[in-house]
Amino acid sequence: MAEPGPEPGRAWRLLALCGAAVFLAAAAAGGALVAWNLAASTARSPRCPEPEQMNATVRPPDSAPEVEELRRRLAEAEQAQENLVWQLQRAEGDKRELEAALKACKDSQSRLQTQLKALKIEMDQAKVRGTQMGLENGMLTEALVRWEATATESKQQLEEALQRAGAAEAAGEACVSREVALREHIYALEAELGTLRKESRLRPRSGSRTKPSISHRPKSGSTKGCRRPPRDPQ
């Protein structure tokens, strides 16, 4: 994560302070140079004539106060120059700090631009993925609808098959019941036939003997649709 750079307002204030300090330093240097030139010109001025060479009625001018004033001004100019030098050094330090801050701002701006480009690329990729996911969701929705329709149809077919199986089971049970009833009837007829045969054997052989008709006897295995095999009579 990039560290936040200095505030732009503070950078501009420091830059304005630096410019003002440079201007004041130049003005003070100019004032000091003027004072220095004035003092030098005063020192180079010709000496006053000797008192004996001057007219007794003319009083020599007293230049001591002017020299003291010039010295005072020179000292003030030197002090101002020192102050301006200090301010100039401080302004140079502020300038270096501003340059470092501006460089940090440029680096931060470059990093932010790089991150912005990366974010734009990610946004474009996210849009593409969103479109693809929308298409996939549409396909999945259609597949789900088809699956639900197939499941409903399969459920209906299963219910119909269960109904048919129940009907077939009921029909099978009814068929088994009919088969059992027919077998019992067959067994009864066979028992009756056996009894008739025994009675015919015990009768005398004279006279004609009529055979009992067994045309009403059902054939074994005549019932169709029942799966149980016929039971052999004991």
Curated annotation (Swiss-Prot):
Residues 203-219 have a biased composition (Basic residues). Residues 44-63, 194-234 are annotated as: Disordered. The keyword rRNA processing does not apply. The keyword Nucleotidyltransferase does not apply. Residues 1-43 form the signal peptide. Residues 67-171 form a coiled coil. Keywords: Coiled coil, Signal. It comes from the Eukaryota. This is Coiled-coil domain-containing protein 194.
